[in-house]
């Protein structure tokens, strides 16, 4: 990398990486269906016990080495350097993710346009059919929107850490927060608001089950962008005298806060119109919410535009973070200029994105192991590469890096019993928890 983050820039960049589409279409639904604040409490505990622990492990790899993921493992390993360097190649998972993630942000861009122009769909059946048509037969819309988002993401990364990634997050993350607060203020005037508050915050411990614990465990890991080199790469540009602990806790808090704000906004309108509160994922965003924004008339067009734009912001900040690890590796290892590195990565990402579109247009084409290209990339990244990357980081820091080096690194910020607890969790509990998540994902 060619520069360092500022302290606030680092926090906002990593928070931008963590805050993504799942904050709108998965987290709120899980909270509401799984015991409200009881689930939130469970999620916070597991985030501190798993996500926080492995986050600090990846941060320590990046900070001590000041290298990209591949070279970081190789530099810090006292022996078997080449073997450990392969652990850094889990950053390929980020390239797979950004290939289909950018396409999804493109869909959201299309819906932002429909909302601004007042052309969203008036009922659930029409909304469902039109969304199905978009992803199964509308190549032009998908191609144009995907290409626009692709260009924004790569242009941002081309400017480097300070002038690209940090600048984007320094204005986009506050803008996301302001949009959500404005939508929340309007939502508070609606009858559905108190129903949303009850749905999200009234604790119901009877709903906590083994399945919910596994869901919370998965969220605790995946919501912090672990396992694909992002944290290692960003930490290589961490400014001196940064308090790692408070920075990490701030990132976790921002991620949770955005998820809850999204939830209050989303479910206020869901309950206001009596829609199905059990939907999640694309069905929640592109069908239920798109319909109710249209039903609200002129104010709905404004709210819809604000909501979809906020999702675009959340998506772009995440996508940008996924490009940087591989770019940093190519620059370090092959002496490439940032421009050449991004051209190479761009060709890969753009090709995979187009294949995702073509695969969705023809369900019989581009099938691998019975999966569309989109589903295959999702499965490889989220069920295999990300968990594996997190496990390898925990094992490497817990058993390969000397404990004394970690005590020196964290000494000013985490001492005594707190360090020892973190170290025990890092070596034994957190990796086992991620293995459980990995196995449960395959058993679904």
Walk through the language-model features, giving the residues of each.
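Membrane-interface "cap" regions at the ends of multi-pass membrane proteins
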Residues: 1-25, 54-59, 63-76, 80-88, ...
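Membrane-embedded translocation segments of transport machinery
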Residues: 2-4, 166, 170-316, 340-341
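Hydrophobic, membrane-embedded alpha-helices of multi-pass small-molecule transporters
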Residues: 5, 12-22, 97-102, 137-159, ...
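Loop-to-transmembrane helix boundary motifs in multi-pass membrane proteins
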Residues: 9-10, 17, 143-144, 254-260, ...
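Inter-helical loop and helix-membrane interface segments of multi-pass membrane transporters/permeases
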Residues: 29-34, 69-89, 102-162, 194-214, ...
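Helix-loop-helix connectors at the membrane interface of multi-pass transporters/channels
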Residues: 105-137, 237-241, 246, 250-258, ...
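Hydrophobic alpha-helical segments of multi-pass membrane transport proteins
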Residues: 315-322, 341-360, 375-408
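A generic transmembrane alpha-helix motif of multi-pass inner-membrane proteins
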Residues: 372-397, 415-444
């Amino acid at each position: 990398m060619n520069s360092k983050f500022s302290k606030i820039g680092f926090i906002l960049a990593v928070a931008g990486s963590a805050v993504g589409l799942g904050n709108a279409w998965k987290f709120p639904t899980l909270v509401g269906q799984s015991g409200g604040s009881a689930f939130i409490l469970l999620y916070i505990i597991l985030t501190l016990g798993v996500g926080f622990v492995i986050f600090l492990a990846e941060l320590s790899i990046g900070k001590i080495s000041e290298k990209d993921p591949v070279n970081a493992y190789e530099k810090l390993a006292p022996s078997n350097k080449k073997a450990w360097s392969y652990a850094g190649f889990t950053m390929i998972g980020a390239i797979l993710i950004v290939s289909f993630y950018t396409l999804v942000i493109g869909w959201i861009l299309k819906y932002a346009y429909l909302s601004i122009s007042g052309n969203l769909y008036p009922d659930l059946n029409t909304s469902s059919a039109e969304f199905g048509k978009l992803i199964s037969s509308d190549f032009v819309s998908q191609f144009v929107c995907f290409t626009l988002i692709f260009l924004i993401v790569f242009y941002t990364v081309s400017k480097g850490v300070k002038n690209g990634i940090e600048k984007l997050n320094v204005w986009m993350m506050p803008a996301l927060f302001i949009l959500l607060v404005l939508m929340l203020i309007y939502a508070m005037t609606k009858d559905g608001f108190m129903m949303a508050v009850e749905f999200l915050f009234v604790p119901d411990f009877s709903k906590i089950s083994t399945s919910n614990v596994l869901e919370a465990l998965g969220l605790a890991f995946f919501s912090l962008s672990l396992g694909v080199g992002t944290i290692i790469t960003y930490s290589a540009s961490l400014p001196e005298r940064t308090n790692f602990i408070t920075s990490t806790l701030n990132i976790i808090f921002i991620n949770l806060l955005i998820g809850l704000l999204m939830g209050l906004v989303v479910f206020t309108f869901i309950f206001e119109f009596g829609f199905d509160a059990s939907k999640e994922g694309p069905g929640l965003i592109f069908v239920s919410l798109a319909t109710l924004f249209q039903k609200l008339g002129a104010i709905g067009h404004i709210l819809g535009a604000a909501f979809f734009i906020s999702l675009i912001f959340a998506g772009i900040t995440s996508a940008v973070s996924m490009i940087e690890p591989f770019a940093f590796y190519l620059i370090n290892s092959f002496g490439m200029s940032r421009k050449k590195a991004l051209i190479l990565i761009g060709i890969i990402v753009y090709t995979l994105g187009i294949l995702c579109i073509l695969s969705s247009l023809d369900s019989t084409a581009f099938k691998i192991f019975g999966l569309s290209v989109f589903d295959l990339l999702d499965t490889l990244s989220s069920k295999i590469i990300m968990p594996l990357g997190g496990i390898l980081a925990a094992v490497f820091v817990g058993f390969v890096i000397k404990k004394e080096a970690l005590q020196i690194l964290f000494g000013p910020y985490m001492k005594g019993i707190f360090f020892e607890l973190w170290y025990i969790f890092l070596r034994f509990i957190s990796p086992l928890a991620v293995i459980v998540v990995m196995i449960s994902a395959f058993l679904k």
